[in-house]
C-alpha cells in the first residue's frame, strides 16, 4: 500500500487580480478549470503568473482566458516554443457557459479573472461576472474603507 502524501503548508493561491475588485462590481463568481501545457504547469508551481490584465472571451460556444501571462522558466525545454501570453481555454460546464454568455451579451457584463489557485493537483481559475465602476463609485469605496478604519481606531481608544 502506498503512503499518503504529506500535506504541504502554504497558500494554494498562485496569483490574484486585486485590481479587478477595485475597478468592477463583482456580481457572481465561478470556478473554471484551465487547459495548460507542461511548461506552464511548471511555471505555475514556481509562482510565475500574472493575471492583472486578463479577461474572458467567448468564441464558438467556448470560453478562453485572454491576457494572462505565465512566464516560462529559464530551464524550459528548447524544442517547445513557450508563448507567455497564449490564449488558454477555460473548462466550464455547458450550463455555466450558457449563463456567462447570456449575461455578457444581454446585460452588458464582462467576465474577469479574479485568482488562479491549486485545487488538489488541478489549476483552477476563479472568474467573476463584473460590471465596471465609475469614478464616483471608486471614491465612495475609498471613503467607506477610510471611515471603517477611523471607526475601529475610535472604538479602540474609547474602550481604554
From Swiss-Prot:
Gene Ontology process terms (BP): trans-translation
GO molecular function, one term: RNA binding
NCBIfam families linked: PRK05422.1, smpB
Any single GO CC term annotated in Swiss-Prot or TrEMBL for this entry: cytosol
CDD domains for this protein: SmpB (cd09294)
Species per Swiss-Prot/TrEMBL record: Yersinia enterocolitica serotype O:8 / biotype 1B (strain NCTC 13174 / 8081)
Subcellular location: Cytoplasm
Similarity section: Belongs to the SmpB family.
InterPro entries: SmpB, SsrA-bd_prot, SsrA-bd_prot_CS
Protein name: SsrA-binding protein
PROSITE patterns (alphabetical): SSRP (PS01317)
Keyword entries, A-Z: Cytoplasm, RNA-binding
Keyword set includes Cytoplasm: yes
Xref: Pfam families: SmpB
Keyword check for RNA-binding: yes
Function noted in UniProt: Required for rescue of stalled ribosomes mediated by trans-translation. Binds to transfer-messenger RNA (tmRNA), required for stable association of tmRNA with ribosomes. tmRNA and SmpB together mimic tRNA shape, replacing the anticodon stem-loop with SmpB. tmRNA is encoded by the ssrA gene; the 2 termini fold to resemble tRNA(Ala) and it encodes a 'tag peptide', a short internal open reading frame. During trans-translation Ala-aminoacylated tmRNA acts like a tRNA, entering the A-site of stalled ribosomes, displacing the stalled mRNA.
PANTHER family: SSRA-BINDING PROTEIN, TMRNA-BINDING COMPONENT OF TRANS-TRANSLATION TAGGING COMPLEX
Amino acid at each position: 500500500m502506498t503512503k499518503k502524501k504529506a500535506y504541504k503548508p502554504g497558500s494554494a493561491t498562485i496569483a490574484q487580480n486585486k485590481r479587478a475588485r477595485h475597478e468592477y462590481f463583482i456580481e457572481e463568481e465561478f470556478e473554471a478549470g484551465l487547459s495548460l501545457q507542461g511548461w506552464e504547469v511548471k511555471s505555475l508551481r514556481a509562482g510565475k503568473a500574472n493575471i492583472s490584465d486578463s479577461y474572458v472571451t467567448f468564441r464558438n460556444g467556448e470560453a478562453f482566458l485572454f491576457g494572462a501571462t505565465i512566464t516560462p522558466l529559464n530551464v524550459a525545454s528548447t524544442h517547445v516554443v513557450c508563448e507567455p501570453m497564449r490564449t488558454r481555454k477555460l473548462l466550464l460546464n455547458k450550463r455555466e457557459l450558457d449563463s456567462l454568455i447570456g449575461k455578457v451579451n444581454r446585460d452588458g457584463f464582462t467576465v474577469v479573472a479574479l485568482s488562479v489557485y491549486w485545487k488538489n493537483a488541478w489549476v483552477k481559475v476563479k472568474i467573476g461576472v463584473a460590471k465596471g465602476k465609475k469614478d464616483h463609485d471608486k471614491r465612495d469605496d475609498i471613503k467607506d474603507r477610510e471611515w471603517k478604519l477611523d471607526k475601529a481606531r475610535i472604538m479602540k481608544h474609547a474602550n481604554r
